[in-house]
């Protein structure tokens, strides 16, 4: 999972959110959609209204990227948008890492179900 590219264009992020495939937990919401690329494209959205300090937002971004690397789950050909909730700061690194791992496994299982149904 270490091979991911950052999604930067607002248009791309909005297209993923409009497709309405999402999984949520107490601390984050993950929108995803399948693509033809061989790599994962990742966007992390953190609201300035909820997290005032830039250092806090940057730390959250680094933690989320570290989770995706630490999760070590093979998800390919997906665009993923992560929205961070204000309750994010309350969770520990290990708990949130397990949470990301479960979310990625859910994405993989939905992907397998879609392939079976087609």
Curated annotation (Swiss-Prot):
Q: What's this protein's function?
A: RNaseP catalyzes the removal of the 5'-leader sequence from pre-tRNA to produce the mature 5'-terminus. It can also cleave other RNA substrates such as 4.5S RNA. The protein component plays an auxiliary but essential role in vivo by binding to the 5'-leader sequence and broadening the substrate specificity of the ribozyme.
Enzyme Commission identifier(s): 3.1.26.5
- One Gene Ontology cellular component: ribonuclease P complex
- Indicate the family of this protein: Belongs to the RnpA family.
Subunit structure as annotated in this protein's UniProt entry = Consists of a catalytic RNA component (M1 or rnpB) and a protein subunit.
Keyword annotations from UniProtKB, A to Z: Endonuclease, Hydrolase, Nuclease, RNA-binding, tRNA processing
Task: Cite the source lineage.
Answer: Bacteria, Bacillati, Mycoplasmatota, Mycoplasmoidales, Mycoplasmoidaceae
Out of the domains of life, which is the source? Bacteria
Which PANTHER family does the record associate with it? Answer: RIBONUCLEASE P PROTEIN COMPONENT (PTHR33992:SF1)
Give the catalysed reaction(s), semicolon-separated. Answer: Endonucleolytic cleavage of RNA, removing 5'-extranucleotides from tRNA precursor
Recorded protein name is: Ribonuclease P protein component
Q: Which Pfam families match?
A: Ribonuclease_P
Residues of the signal peptide: none
Q: Name one GO molecular function term.
A: ribonuclease P activity
Keyword flag Hydrolase:
yes
């Amino acid at each position: 999972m270490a091979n991911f590219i950052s999604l930067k264009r607002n248009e791309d992020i909005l297209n993923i959110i409009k497709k309405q495939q999402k999984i949520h937990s107490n601390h984050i919401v993950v929108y995803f959609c399948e693509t033809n690329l061989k790599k994962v494209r990742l966007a992390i959205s953190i609201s300035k209204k909820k997290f005032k300090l830039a250092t806090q937002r940057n730390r959250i971004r680094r933690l989320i990227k570290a989770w995706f690397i630490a999760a070590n789950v093979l998800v390919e050909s997906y665009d993923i948008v992560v929205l961070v909730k204000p309750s994010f700061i309350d969770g520990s690194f290990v708990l949130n890492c397990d949470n990301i791992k479960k979310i990625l496994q859910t994405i993989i299982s939905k992907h397998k179900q879609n392939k079976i149904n087609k």
